């Protein structure tokens, strides 16, 4: 009888051990996003988190932190790069100084329009940019829209390059943007996105440049009522993951996470298109003075030295720039 009990206990222990060995401990990730609730990126990143949990069968959960509550964008990029955060929704502008291949999208007028950007990023150019990002420890899972950036300020309409002369213009922290404003005769003021409203209100800067949804959602239109449709930059955003975190996943979960990101990108692009229209309508009703720019070639010509200087310093990137420009 005692031997039978011992045998049964042994079988029970083996069964428990076997069960425990098949238990998968859920991974809990944290994700960063600068935008407020309701913004297309915020809605899409929440959908991404939902899809990650669903597609991995609960093996991975993602908690999103919106409105930049975990820090500013350059710091968050660094945190994802070193593994302090797993996920981030980043604009490629602040990432460019760290990843030269990603920086080419910050060259003024490199994209003709949104469709051109989509085709370039969804093709060979996007693959090269992704490879450049992986060199610094970041994997691009999917590309989000970020619209076309135009100038706005509190002083006057901008119709021609010389209208920027003397204006203090906030830019993201990237030498390409500072060079762009300097080429127009303006005074670039790199600063964090969260500081722009107060800086516009108090006159620390005269203007900035961004897309319609950001201009509206931040309230910048309340303190800088002149919006001039220069569309000088079309900078994509990415859903990014730390490379070590991504490479530690099973093939099944790698596929699941990438699928989740790309499905969220489809949602984000659709939401972005609608939000751009509604944001424009809202600020126009609020009394913003809007103007088209009939001669954008004058701006292209004035900003050409930015291209020349950057590619002279980075000749290895000339083929990538040509690839983007020649994307049909």
Describe the predicted segments one by one.
Residues 1-11:
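Bacterial N-terminal signal peptides that target proteins for export
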Residues 9, 26-116, 124-328:
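N-terminal secretory/targeting leader peptides
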Residues 10-19:
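Bacterial N-terminal signal peptides
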Residues 19-26:
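Sec/Tat signal peptide C-region and signal peptidase I cleavage site
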């Amino acid at each position: 009888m005692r031997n039978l009990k011992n045998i049964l206990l042994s079988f029970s222990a083996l069964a428990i051990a076997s069960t425990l060995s098949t238990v998968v401990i859920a991974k809990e990730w944290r994700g960063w996003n600068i935008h407020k609730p309701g913004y297309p990126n915020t809605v899409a990143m929440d959908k991404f988190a939902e899809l990650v949990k669903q597609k991995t069968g609960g093996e991975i959960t993602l908690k999103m932190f919106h409105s930049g509550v975990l820090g500013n964008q350059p710091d968050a990029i660094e945190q994802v790069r070193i593994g302090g955060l797993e996920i981030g929704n980043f604009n490629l502008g602040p990432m460019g100084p760290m990843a030269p291949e990603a920086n080419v999208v910050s060259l003024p007028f490199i994209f003709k329009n949104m469709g051109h950007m989509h085709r370039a990023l969804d093709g060979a150019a996007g693959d090269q940019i992704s490879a450049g990002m992986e060199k610094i420890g970041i994997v691009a899972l999917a590309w989000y829209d970020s619209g076309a950036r135009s100038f706005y300020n509190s002083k006057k309409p901008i119709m021609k390059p010389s209208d920027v002369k003397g204006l203090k213009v906030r830019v993201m922290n990237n030498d390409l943007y500072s060079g762009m404003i300097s080429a127009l005769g303006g005074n670039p003021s790199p600063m964090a996105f969260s500081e722009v409203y107060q800086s516009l209100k108090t006159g620390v800067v005269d203007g900035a440049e961004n897309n319609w949804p950001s201009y509206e959602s931040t309230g910048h239109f309340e303190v800088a009522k002149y919006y001039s449709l220069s569309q000088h930059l079309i900078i994509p955003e990415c859903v990014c993951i730390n490379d070590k975190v991504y490479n530690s996943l099973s093939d099944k979960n790698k596929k699941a996470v990438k699928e989740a990101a790309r499905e969220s990108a489809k949602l984000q692009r659709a939401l972005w298109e609608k939000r751009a229209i509604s944001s424009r309508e809202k600020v126009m009703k609020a009394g913003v003075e809007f103007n088209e720019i009939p001669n954008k070639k004058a701006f292209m010509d004035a900003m050409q030295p930015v291209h020349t200087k950057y590619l002279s310093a980075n000749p290895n990137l000339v083929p990538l720039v040509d690839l983007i420009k020649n994307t049909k």
